[in-house]
């Protein structure tokens, strides 16, 4: 998947748990959980939906590395190319 496809997958996964969120509302350099008002359970459901659509797992140890949309997209691109 290219970066645009990954971004669309991320937005769709966010909308699974927060359907009111529009992709253009997300500041790519701000904390994703705060931008989308995701509590810890919402965040886990979001990551599960993302794994289902991309086949890329983000282990708990890496949660701190993917706290913004840009960081998450970078992470997914690296993981997808391995």
Language-model features: where?
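Phosphopantetheine-dependent thiolation modules in NRPS/PKS and related acyl-activating systems
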Residues: 2-38, 42-45, 52-53, 57-82
């Amino acid at each position: 998947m290219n970066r645009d496809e990954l971004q669309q997958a991320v937005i769709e996964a966010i909308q699974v748990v927060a359907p009111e969120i529009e992709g253009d509302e997300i500041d790519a350099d701000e904390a994703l959980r705060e931008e989308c008002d995701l509590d810890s359970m919402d965040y886990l459901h979001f990551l599960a939906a993302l794994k289902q659509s991309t086949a890329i797992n983000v282990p708990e140890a890496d949660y701190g590395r993917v706290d913004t949309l840009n960081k998450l997209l970078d992470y997914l691109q690296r993981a997808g190319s391995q």
